[in-house]
Amino acid sequence: MSLNDDQLQALAYLNRGCNVFITGSAGTGKTHLIRFFIHDQHTYGKQIGITATTGAAALHIGGKTLHSFMAIGLAKKSAEALAMQTMTKNKRTAKKLRALDTLVIDEVSLMDAELFDKLSAYLQIIRDDVRPFGGVQLVLCGDFAQLPPVSGSYCFTSKVWKQANIKLAKLTTPMRQQDDTVFFSLLERARWGSLTEEDMETLRSRVQATESFPDYIVPTRLYSVNADVDAINSQHLQDILDKGETMQQYEPKYEGGAEAQKERTRAWATSLGVPARLALCRGAQVVVTYNINQEDLVNGTRAVVEDLSPTSVIIKLKNGVRKVISPIVVSCDDDKSLRVTYLPLKLAWAVTIHRSQGLTLDAVQMDLGNRIFATGQAYTALSRAKTLESVSIISLSPNAFKADPLVLKFYGVSQ
């Protein structure tokens, strides 16, 4: 595994034991550097926690989701309550965290400031060490110019970020778009919300463009809102059903005695993204929506339905491995009376831009119109592609590309 000059500079910080935030444009080799560092640390017998804020990102680096590794559930309780719970009821995790040398957090840009501070306090208590994150070396990776946290403020605004003396390591060499440097330069301007009129003309040339896609490649469609994604997926499913395949429907089971309790459970499950009804058939493109295991069935795993029964589904992963998916039982972290049983799959001919973060797509179609609602969203979608020719744009708005002023200030970018 070779590294470029930017990556070697970042590695020098890491090897000195510094807390480091590895950042850069999409496709500049951030995850590659993380993998290199992890391999390096293992050879020296270091205890390293390999985590990411999303299941899909965790899969890329061979780790676990941050919440799973830390055993903090939904992290709704205080740091003190979470630490006490771990030390009394999950002593194995407490022992693991006390022995930890380094904590890797990929896609840290999706974490809000409140959780960042809470995790630091949590480790301080468990490790009995008042230093930020209990003295554990932090290796953070992400890009604040991409998608912001779902709620709350950026973690770089937290108290602990300043206290931890985190070094900034910027990667600038394109890896994903290395064969299309013109496209990479356009993406850099899109990252900061400073596209030129020439850039917009270039993007307009890709509106409804599909000539570069071979017939057997169906571009993955990216949308900013779930409603658009649902419409595309429903149409593709119907196309398969029209050819004679049989549909199987799966409905969640909401536990609770009284009807009012079931309604509470239903509302809670909906907030988790559990659909009221899931329709599948053989040939359906799906995505796993829950971290079933830490190896190959995590939130974000893509697959195709090979067979199905009233109680389970057989899916085929991208690597050809077949897996049986059965309903799972999920309970609320703060109220164990809230329990739902459901099949953790979702149709995936189209996906939201949020779910696409971290992917590299050879053929991608996206909506960059007026439905873009978050800073960094359009840039995240566009930067999934390797080349401009691999992009087809459904609709385009000049207002779609915007950067948060806080992010511009953090990176020292002036406009």
Stretches found by the model and what they are:
Residues M1-Q415:
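Conserved ATP-binding/catalytic motifs of P-loop helicase motor domains
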